[in-house]
């Protein structure tokens, strides 16, 4: 039986949160550092389940690194080439999508004999579009269980060239190709077919790649020209900014029950798209101030909105919670890719929002929410999804208790989330 956690009603939130490092940036930075030409010192690294899977893989590949959990740092000796495992290997990557997709592309570059696998949910998350793109460049990849889904067997062979990849399901497929193609034998042209989702995550990838010495030219995110036979050049030191998706919970708490909450580690200079979450809160009526590396939110009366949130899919989940405390209807649009995340988030959010008294309409790629007349105590199923657990913790701001089942799923990206939340709460 999974453990549950009951949160008592919170009367006020006030204080400062120093954000943990971004998961998306940490895993990319670990991978690029490992393949770079010398030693890289990473600061403000995130230590969580998802990043541990990447570190475990680096260790198996023979990469030498020294991590300090107290200083949130990691020093990595680059191997100056794509990651490689000389013997037949099976790698278990849990439900770490960023790690799985990027490693699938990198292991396609060398002669390997690797089975990439994951947990039950990972085996339900489609990977066909990435596999097809890698196969176009010569990769030998086969499905070992269900067609179009992990686990996959990788035997190398990817040399680049003309690649077509769908942008419809996940931007991680394109990110993986952008990380791998500079190391391929041939120059590559990557053409994105179908509309690209979560575009800001591509900006994160391009930003990281440029910090490691590689520039990629693109035409409006539809065509990317990549020179092959390049090397990743270590920046010597790289500081990972705070996790903008994780910031959303604390900023939302302030908008609902502030006080004033300041999050540090992200701000005007952030490379993450999810900082735009603060602008959405502002549209809903919250008081927002941006600094270079901080954001402050204060409570004001909130109103519902109708908005396309394709660019901030993770933080958009938090807006679904803010909607419960807002006047009128909220519609979150263009979020089909919620369905292929850690769980089918559209279905899961609909089910759990209804439990606490909200009126909800679930569309194919949107969710419509009317706030409860009265909040109802509920036991929230978290679906082993860290973001659902973190979102629904905010129901305690309603004046009633809330119970979260399997609350430790937050370990995926934010192991001390509940302690951090408690640090700004008055009861």
Swiss-Prot record:
Residues annotated as catalytic: 314
Keywords for this protein: Amino-acid biosynthesis, Aromatic amino acid biosynthesis, Cytoplasm, Transferase
GO terms for biological process, alphabetical: amino acid biosynthetic process; aromatic amino acid family biosynthetic process; chorismate biosynthetic process
A molecular function GO annotation: 3-phosphoshikimate 1-carboxyvinyltransferase activity
SUPFAM superfamilies xref list: EPT/RTPC-like
EC class of the enzyme, as a word: transferase
Pathway the protein contributes to: Metabolic intermediate biosynthesis; chorismate biosynthesis; chorismate from D-erythrose 4-phosphate and phosphoenolpyruvate: step 6/7
InterPro entries: Enolpyruvate_Tfrase_dom, Enolpyruvate_Tfrase_sf, EPSP_synthase, EPSP_synthase_CS, RNA3'P_cycl/enolpyr_Trfase_a/b
Positions of phosphoenolpyruvate binding: 23, 97, 125, 172, 345, 387, 412
Task performed by this protein: Catalyzes the transfer of the enolpyruvyl moiety of phosphoenolpyruvate (PEP) to the 5-hydroxyl of shikimate-3-phosphate (S3P) to produce enolpyruvyl shikimate-3-phosphate and inorganic phosphate.
NCBIfam families: aroA
Protein name: 3-phosphoshikimate 1-carboxyvinyltransferase
Higher taxonomy: Bacteria, Pseudomonadati, Pseudomonadota, Gammaproteobacteria, Enterobacterales
């Amino acid at each position: 039986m999974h453990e549950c956690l009951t949160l008592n009603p919170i009367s006020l939130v006030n204080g400062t949160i120093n954000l943990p490092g971004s998961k998306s940036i940490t895993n990319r930075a670990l991978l690029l550092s490992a393949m770079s030409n010398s030693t890289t010192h990473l600061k403000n690294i995130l230590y969580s389940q998802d990043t541990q899977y990447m570190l475990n893989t680096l260790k198996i590949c023979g990469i030498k690194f020294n991590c300090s959990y107290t200083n949130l740092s990691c020093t990595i000796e680059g191997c100056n080439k794509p990651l490689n495992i000389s013997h037949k290997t099976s790698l278990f990557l849990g439900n770490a999508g960023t790690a799985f997709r990027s490693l699938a592309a990198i292991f396609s570059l060398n002669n390997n004999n690797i089975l990439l696998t994951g947990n039950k949910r990972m085996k339900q998350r489609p990977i066909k579009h990435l596999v097809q793109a890698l196969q176009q460049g010569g990769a030998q990849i086969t499905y070992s269980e269900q067609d179009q889904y992990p686990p996959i067997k990788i035997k190398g062979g990817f040399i680049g060239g003309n690649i077509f990849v769908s942008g419809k399901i996940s931007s991680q497929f394109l990110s993986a190709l952008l990380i791998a193609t500079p190391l391929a034998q041939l120059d590559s042209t990557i053409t994105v077919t179908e509309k690209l989702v979560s575009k800001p995550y591509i900006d994160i990838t391009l930003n990281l790649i440029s910090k490691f010495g590689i520039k990629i030219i693109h035409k409006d995110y539809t065509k990317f020209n990549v020179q092959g036979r390049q090397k990743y050049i270590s920046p010597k030191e790289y500081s990972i900014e705070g996790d903008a998706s994780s910031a959303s919970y604390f900023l939302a708490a302030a908008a609902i029950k502030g006080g004033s909450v300041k999050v540090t580690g992200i701000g005007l200079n952030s490379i993450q798209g999810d900082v735009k979450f603060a602008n959405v809160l502002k549209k809903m009526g919250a008081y927002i101030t941006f600094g270079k590396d901080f954001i402050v939110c204060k409570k004001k009366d909130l109103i519902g909105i109708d908005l396309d949130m394709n660019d901030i899919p993770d933080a958009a989940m938090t807006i679904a919670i803010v909607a419960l405390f807002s006047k009128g209807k909220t519609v979150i649009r263009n979020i089909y890719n919620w369905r292929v995340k850690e769980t089918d988030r559209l279905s899961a959010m609909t089910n759990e929002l209804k439990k606490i008294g909200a009126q909800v309409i679930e569309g194919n790629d949107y969710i419509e929410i009317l706030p409860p007349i009265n909040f109802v105590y509920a036991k929230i199923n978290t679906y082993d999804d860290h973001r659902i657990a973190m979102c629904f913790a905010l129901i305690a701001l309603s004046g009633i208790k809330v119970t979260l089942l399997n609350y430790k799923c937050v370990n995926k990206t934010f192991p001390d989330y509940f302690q951090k939340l408690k640090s700004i709460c008055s009861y």
